[in-house]
Curated annotation (Swiss-Prot):
It comes from Chaetodipus formosus (Long-tailed pocket mouse). Binds 2 heme b groups non-covalently. PROSITE patterns: CYTB_CTER (PS51003), CYTB_NTER (PS51002). The lineage of its organism: Eukaryota, Metazoa, Chordata, Craniata, Vertebrata. Heme 1 (or BL or b562) is low-potential and absorbs at about 562 nm, and heme 2 (or BH or b566) is high-potential and absorbs at about 566 nm. It comes from the Eukaryota. This is Cytochrome b.
Length: 379
């Protein structure tokens, strides 16, 4: 008799995706972040569901409902901090996952890569709307500033902003719709993750060498299930340490003050995981130019497959590209730091140089490095 996992229609799908899936024998720990992102999504949806049971999306009660969750609900403080810091964990894993994709040339699986970019946009939208919900000072002013950027769109900008706000300012209608979207988007993300995996399993995983691994495959279970489990244990240990000992480290103290439209905080800034894009936005003095640069800072990921000039897929044996890659990582860290600083010298010029360097490395230097390496390696 056939084993049930190979014959049952539902189990068969799970079997092909997580048990009998042929995987390259040499994929490193950098390939763990896919499963860790799945874990992050489960943590966020679960904790978010329990928060939604006690949260009220009304401007008069939103702030106090979050306080009520922390003070009166059983382990409400824990659920709230898991959810708030879970977003940071999500983006750490997300950025490492993207970085691995760039380093090892995984972007040449174009369909998987493009779905990944859509997933990144959806996750960023979800995180932004979630940050507005506690209705603290930074929530309110962050929502006002970021939604206002759409007014830079010629002709339809102002109408578009008022349509999103549901009025002439960020108010009750805005909060209610943001809550609705923040609730539904994670489920759309989960559906898109399925599509992401579908495309990935069409081609199979890439590997650190960037060469075809058809001749050397091993089953996903038990090898990579146990490896993923180790990653999960390490991640959860670090995460819970952070949640229980430093829950407010990444948050903004301003968000412990209720939203007040008559009092602007001295420095309006988004959460840390958006600071690099915020720095790029601020480095251009023109409003529309800044918005375009902001969108392009993420959309530029889509050109990686088009600008791959090297004859080798992975950067493993390409020292010039490696140097540029780590320069890009350092540049993103500088942009993240600048995004959290006030708009004054010397931060303005540092941000502008870092923004130019970001696009320069991706669009010009990496493709040139690929061509040079082809010559050097006589590939």
């Amino acid at each position: 008799m056939t084993i049930i996992r190979k014959s049952h229609p539902l189990m068969k799908m799970v079997n092909h995706a997580f048990i009998d899936l042929p995987a390259p024998s040499n994929i490193s720990g950098w390939w763990n972040f896919g499963s860790l992102l799945g874990l992050c999504l489960i943590i966020q949806i679960s904790s978010g569901l329990f928060l939604a049971m006690h949260y009220t999306s009304d401007t008069l009660t939103a702030f106090s409902s979050v306080a009520h969750i922390c003070r009166d609900v059983n382990y409400g403080w824990l659920i709230r901090y898991i959810h708030a810091n879970g977003a940071s964990l999500f983006f750490i894993c997300l950025y490492l996952h993207i970085g691995r994709g760039i380093y090892y040339g995984s972007y040449l699986y174009k369909e998987t890569w493009n779905i990944g970019i859509i997933l990144l946009f959806l996750t960023m939208a979800t995180a932004f709307m979630g940050y507005v919900l506690p209705w603290g000072q930074m929530s309110f002013w962050g929502a006002t500033v970021i939604t206002n950027l759409l007014s830079a769109i010629p002709y339809v900008g102002t109408d578009l902003v008022e349509w999103i706000w549901g009025g002439f300012s960020v108010d009750k209608a805005t909060l209610t719709r943001f809550f609705a979207f923040h609730f539904i988007l994670p489920f759309i993300i989960a559906a898109m993750v399925m599509v992401h995996l579908l495309f990935l399993h069409e081609t199979g995983s890439n590997n650190p060498l960037g060469i075809p691994s058809d001749s050397d495959k091993i089953p996903f279970h038990p090898y990579y299930t146990s490896k993923d489990l180790l990653g999960v244990v390490i991640l959860l240990a670090l995460f819970l340490t952070f949640v229980l000992f430093f829950p407010d480290l990444l948050g903004d103290p301003d968000n412990y003050s209720p939203a007040n439209p008559l009092n602007t905080p001295p420095h309006i800034k988004p959460e840390w995981y958006f600071l690099f894009a915020y720095a790029i936005l601020r480095s251009i003095p023109n409003k529309l130019g800044g918005v375009i640069a902001l969108v392009l800072s993420i959309l530029v990921l889509a050109v990686f497959p088009l600008l791959h000039t090297a004859n080798q897929r992975s950067m493993m044996f390409r020292p010039i590209s490696q140097t540029l890659f780590w320069t890009l990582v350092s540049d993103l860290m500088i942009l993240t730091w600048i995004g959290g600083q006030p708009v004054e010298p010397p931060f303005i010029i540092i941000g502008q140089i870092a923004s130019i360097l970001y696009f320069l490395i991706i669009l010009i230097l990496l493709p040139i490095a690929g061509l040079i390496e082809n010559k050097i390696l006589k590939w």
